[in-house]
Amino acid sequence: MAKKNQLTTSEHLDYQEYERLLQCLHDDGEYKWEMYARLSFCTACRVSDVIQFKWHHILNVPSVNVTEKKTGKTRTIPINPSVQKKFREMYILLGRPDMKDYVLPSTQGDKPITIQRINQKLKWFKSKYRLKIDNFSTHTFRKTFGRYVYETSNRSAESLLLLNKILNHHSIQTTKAYIGITQDEINGIFNSIQF
């Protein structure tokens, strides 16, 4: 695990593995961590933004406005009815916290959880649930979102353009590297051409 302010390399989870993680967390009553995984995926936000969410920001709203800490850019993220419903279910499972509370509180409650603590727990969940991922960190769910969009859009160039905008990357190359598109995958596309 990286130390504070140290760069890390993380990977995306295959979507089926992501769903398995959600089910394991749910079955074990790890609702706070299930909520973290869902919120990170559904918003595609960086962890520095995710930990700032309070319940009134995300519950029973059609969209979330986020001013990204890293870029200073503001994004409006739609929260579709299915996601709204799941967030309400999680809110109830978490004991209906005050709407002004952080979704992911620290043990003190009046502050959000730390990024270091999240990474510690993710490392623990990786081991406990035997997740098929080498580098599991706070960036994993954002990358999983990106890979999910790319895969469900049939690996289209349009999906890369959309992801580039959603993730606020400076270039398509950054987006490709971010979601784990490898040279082998690119070669595979060219090698699949048949006449």
Name each region found by the language model.
Residues T9, S82, S156, G180-F195:
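DNA/chromatin major-groove-contacting recognition/catalytic segments
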Residues S82-I133:
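Active-site/catalytic core of tyrosine-dependent DNA strand-transfer enzymes
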Residues Q52-V83:
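Conserved tyrosine-mediated DNA breakage-rejoining catalytic core shared by Y-recombinases
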Residues D49-V50, G146, N154-N168:
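Active-site-proximal segment of tyrosine recombinases
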Residues E34-R46, V64, R147-T152:
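Short pre-functional
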Residues I133-T152:
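Short basic/aromatic active-site micro-motif
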